[in-house]
Amino acid sequence: MATTFLRNLFSQAQPSLLRRPLMPSSSSILPAAARLFSSTPAQNATLNQVMRGCRKPQRARHAVSPALSSIKSPALKGVCVKVGITRPKKPNSGERKTARVRLSTGKVITAYIPGEGHNISQHSVVLVRGGRAQDCPGVRYHLVRGALDLAGVATRMSSRSKYGTKKPKKASVG
């Protein structure tokens, strides 16, 4: 089996593999336009590397927000099952407001409530988007402020669009 593989490998149109120069010439340093920004020449896998299985495809990354990415939806509606707090991971301290939400697909997830203060309670209808809370374990979703039953942050002046706050009215002079 291995001898047949080796015979086919070297007998076809690859005699240059046996007579490869020790140092690459200046013409072989940039073999393709795809390698223009690389500082080293492209190297093919050796026979031992191929036999070990180096040409397996890379595994796909896991989804950050699997309940949304599995149905390819940017946001989903859900009903709050429980509202509570979560303690953040080690270097941080505080209380992060979270909610357990039953999505319209039937899955129950934990979502972070952004901003200061909120008005949701059990049975509130909320809109859930992807994106994890980096210092809260198991929290892979955010609630959208200013959508459905979750009101925007009332006193917010900067980054208002992220917190569902309307532009404040200008005070009229006179």
UniProtKB/Swiss-Prot annotation:
Pfam families membership: Ribosom_S12_S23
UniProt KW DNA damage keyword: no
Keywords noted in UniProt: Mitochondrion, Ribonucleoprotein, Ribosomal protein
InterPro entries xref list: NA-bd_OB-fold, Ribosomal_uS12, Ribosomal_uS12_bac
GO biological process annotation, one example: translation
Domain of life: Eukaryota
Main location as per UniProt: mitochondrion
Record flagged with keyword Mitochondrion: yes
Location of this chain's protein in the cell: Mitochondrion
Gene Ontology cellular component annotations, sorted alphabetically: mitochondrial small ribosomal subunit; ribosome
Molecular function per GO: structural constituent of ribosome
Known partners and oligomeric status: Component of the mitochondrial small ribosomal subunit (mt-SSU). Mature N.crassa 74S mitochondrial ribosomes consist of a small (37S) and a large (54S) subunit. The 37S small subunit contains a 16S ribosomal RNA (16S mt-rRNA) and 32 different proteins. The 54S large subunit contains a 23S rRNA (23S mt-rRNA) and 42 different proteins. uS12m forms part of the decoding center of the mt-SSU.
PANTHER family tied to this protein: 30S RIBOSOMAL PROTEIN S12 FAMILY MEMBER (PTHR11652)
Function: Component of the mitochondrial ribosome (mitoribosome), a dedicated translation machinery responsible for the synthesis of mitochondrial genome-encoded proteins, including at least some of the essential transmembrane subunits of the mitochondrial respiratory chain. The mitoribosomes are attached to the mitochondrial inner membrane and translation products are cotranslationally integrated into the membrane.
Family: Belongs to the universal ribosomal protein uS12 family.
NCBIfam families: rpsL_bact
Identification of the protein by name: Small ribosomal subunit protein uS12m
Organism: Neurospora crassa (strain ATCC 24698 / 74-OR23-1A / CBS 708.71 / DSM 1257 / FGSC 987)
Gene: mrps12
